Regions:
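Acidic, metal/ion-coordinating pockets
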Residues: 2-223
Length: 223
């Protein structure tokens, strides 16, 4: 059982739902292949809403990045009609996500696109290991805190620091991507000291066997 924020001890059941690598699949139709598509956010929201009816605020909805590219709807929103709210932000806001990380394919769209998207997204955009090189401060919010049914939850977000190996610097100018393990240790100490959470969730946009292993970086770090 969790020790709740109240003085009594009780069993609290939480439901944590996480999406990742949506790649613009918002609607149940593949606009590239021109045929119906399984999955997609249109179906995810039906599932999430059914769980919200059961769990209420004991449900935490998280996204792990790579949402800005993939379908023509994203390209249109990102580059053809950027004056309107970004469709990825609109979907995240409509589905009432609690927190989100940024992925390497989001960075690939360039500053003008992802900076606007970040501003338009209502939930915290997390990235503890992304640093503004001009100010030497976090470019994104490192972590978010949620209190659900007396349980204090910390969500720490990070993304792969291999971005400079894949993307031209013009896409991420002014940013530095720190190694994940040392960054996690640094922020975990801060979270434990300042927040004293009951649970810590790692929301890391990083994979297994990514093909890059150096003294400074290991793609399997999140594991």
């Amino acid at each position: 059982p969790f020790q709740s924020m109240a003085t009594t001890q009780q069993n609290i059941e939480l439901r944590i739902i996480q999406t990742s690598d949506v790649h613009g699949c918002f609607f149940p139709y593949d606009f590239i292949e021109r045929k119906p598509k399984e999955g997609t956010m249109a179906r995810v929201i039906t599932y999430v809403d059914s769980l919200r009816n059961i769990y209420g605020d004991r449900l935490l909805l998280l996204d792990n990045g790579d949402i800005l590219q993939g379908q023509p709807t994203c390209y249109y929103s990102n580059f053809v009609n950027p004056q309107q709210p970004n469709i990825a932000a609109s979907v995240i806001n409509y589905m009432k996500y609690d927190a989100q990380t940024i992925g390497n394919h989001d960075v690939e769209t360039g500053h003008a696109v992802y900076d606007k998207w970040i501003k338009e997204t209502k939930c915290p955009m997390l990235g503890a290991n992304v640093t503004n090189t001009h100010t030497n401060t976090p470019y994104l919010k490192p972590y978010a805190i949620f209190n659900r049914a007396g349980v204090k939850i910390a969500v720490l977000g990070m993304l792969t620091p291999a971005i400079p190996n894949w993307l031209n610097e013009s896409l991420w100018s002014g940013l530095r991507f720190e190694e994940m393990v040392s960054c996690a240790k640094k922020w975990m100490a801060i979270i434990q000291r300042d927040e004293k959470p009951d649970i810590v969730i790692g929301l890391f946009h990083s994979g297994k066997d990514g093909g890059i292993h150096t003294e400074q970086y290991d793609e399997d770090a999140s594991i």
